[in-house]
């Protein structure tokens, strides 16, 4: 039934925002800086629909997003559809679709709007825009370093100083080597990495209990290694993941980056990461949060599309 005398409210849907001209001007400026920097590094822009099939996210996206935060529905053809919660599976799908036609290494970027049904809070709404920068077809440590240097250039372009933020870096491959050294079963690696990523966000006792539930007595030794300054590198210095990450760090330090910090508790939440992971973290106590984040995902295209 249509019609009636009920007046409509002027508020936007909960968790999203309107952009009046003065606010749109600010967003446009931010986007223009992003574009100027990434294009100076040789990245080409792409885009895709906000609609994707549900199965694209089921296997590799963070379980919390899939189980609790997706905007999903069935269309009139009875297909399960989502509003994209992240862009990486989408760009992986696009590259897989024309893999033999795309010159490698391929440098692509996009500024997508993304949707997650989560509790709206400061700095986190149900719709947000982010800069996605991806390089395909390179196994060089320089590729890992390049993305971090690019993010660092963006911060400088906005006027940030080195002490305004720190660049935290780790490696999922290095952490997997650590789990193997501690004889933690391989099938536990993903859940352990998710728990470790929460270490600085939950009480110490809660963190310990979560680890003990998964790995028993190995939890105490794992915590001691994570808490020591160089414990992970000292234990695994001769391994391939440690040597690779050291090469990435060396490239970054030679590029005059001053605020790099090895952070073994940084693992990032997505299951598709296989190597280096990083975050640019705001050091201002009033805005203590990640600004940029990402990492290497070597197997995503093959895992999803064969």
Language-model features and meaning:
Residues 10, 57-61, 273-275:
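Short secondary-structure transition/capping segments
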Residues 44-50:
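A short beta-strand-loop structural module common to alpha/beta enzyme folds
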Residues 166-177:
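Glycine-rich, mobile lid/loop segments that gate access to catalytic sites or pores
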